[in-house]
């Protein structure tokens, strides 16, 4: 058996291997590649932070005990009417991008704490996703 394997020529000699080598990366190519990856990661982090804030997952700032927003109602794209409680007095304010105008003053009234805008609980993501993905049925 050993003699038969010695006498037969190996087909390896007829095949030649060709190695394709890539040119080495220059410093400018490497810097561009690393910079673009870093910029992509930063944009991804900013996008996640923006989504967390919009969906209500970001922690809310501590409430100021001297000033409490009782209610708020948008009346335009950047205009809103806000009721603020200060020293047992409700101030009805008109708020725009340029100014805040006092509209009316009322004595403070007892409010339901659950309806207060400052005590809103964060929305459950699962419920929010189901609400967004729910498609209205078409009626013809």
Curated annotation (Swiss-Prot):
The keyword Membrane applies. The keyword Cell membrane applies. Keywords: Bacterial flagellum, Cell membrane, Membrane, Transmembrane, Transmembrane helix, Virulence. It is found in: Cell membrane; Bacterial flagellum basal body. One of its GO terms (biological process) is bacterial-type flagellum organization. Residues 104-124 are annotated as: Disordered. Belongs to the FliO/MopB family. This is Protein MopB.
